[in-house]
């Protein structure tokens, strides 16, 4: 079974209670459960990990090589600041789909810049928790023989 890592960055452990008007009321546990179930329905094994620490996220990306075939990444605020995450993604040569619950392009100007997007397969934002499932679908299609490039 194809294995995918779903990686959540800083403050995503507070989903459901942190700014629900922006991020919704779905908790991280609910997101993870939905990702695992959705992945199974697509023939994917899904592992989920959250950290508030940039180095731990870099370590998780490095450790994914040889274990997982792709990564769904919501880097949170590190999207806009972390060259380390960008370099980690480039170094493992795995397809990454960047996810954001809110539409980062419709928010504050500093959120319009993503250091992840240039090294990602694609970006999904503004669809709430559904964005994670869309990202899993995108990776499944990309990794299928028909989606190979």
UniProtKB/Swiss-Prot annotation:
Protein's pathway: Metabolic intermediate biosynthesis; chorismate biosynthesis; chorismate from D-erythrose 4-phosphate and phosphoenolpyruvate: step 3/7
PROSITE patterns hit by this protein: DEHYDROQUINASE_II
NCBIfam families according to UniProt: aroQ (TIGR01088), PRK05395.1-2 (NF003805), PRK05395.1-3 (NF003806), PRK05395.1-4 (NF003807)
Pfam families (alphabetical): DHquinase_II
UniProt family annotation: Belongs to the type-II 3-dehydroquinase family.
GO biological process, alphabetically ordered: amino acid biosynthetic process; aromatic amino acid family biosynthetic process; chorismate biosynthetic process; quinate catabolic process
Subunit structure: Homododecamer.
InterPro entries: DHquinase_II, DHquinase_II_CS, DHquinase_II_sf
Highest taxon of the lineage: Bacteria
Chain positions of site Transition state stabilizer: 18
Keyword Amino-acid biosynthesis: yes
Record: active site: 23, 100
Catalysis: reaction(s): 3-dehydroquinate = 3-dehydroshikimate + H2O
Keyword entries, A-Z: Amino-acid biosynthesis, Aromatic amino acid biosynthesis, Lyase
CDD domains: DHQase_II
Protein name: 3-dehydroquinate dehydratase
EC number: 4.2.1.10
Residues the entry annotates as binding substrate: 74, 80, 87, 101-102, 111
The keyword Amino-acid biosynthesis appears for this protein: yes
Function: Catalyzes a trans-dehydration via an enolate intermediate.
Record-level Gene Ontology MF annotations: 3-dehydroquinate dehydratase activity
Enzyme class: lyase
């Amino acid at each position: 079974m194809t294995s995918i890592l779903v990686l959540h960055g800083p403050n995503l452990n507070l989903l459901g209670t942190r700014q629900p008007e922006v991020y919704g009321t779905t908790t991280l546990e609910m997101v993870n459960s939905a990702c695992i179930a959705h992945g199974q329905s697509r023939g994917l094994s899904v592992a989920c990990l959250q950290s508030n620490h940039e180095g731990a996220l870099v370590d998780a990306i490095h450790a994914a090589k040889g274990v997982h075939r792709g990564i769904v990444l919501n880097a949170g605020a590190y999207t806009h600041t972390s060259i380390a995450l960008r370099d980690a993604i480039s170094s493992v040569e795995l397809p990454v789909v960047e996810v954001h619950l809110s539409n980062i392009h419709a928010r504050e100007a500093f959120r319009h810049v993503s250091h992840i997007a240039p090294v990602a397969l694609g970006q999904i934002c503004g669809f709430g928790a559904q964005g994670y499932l869309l990202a899993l679908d995108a990776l499944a299609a990309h990794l299928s023989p028909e989606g190979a490039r």
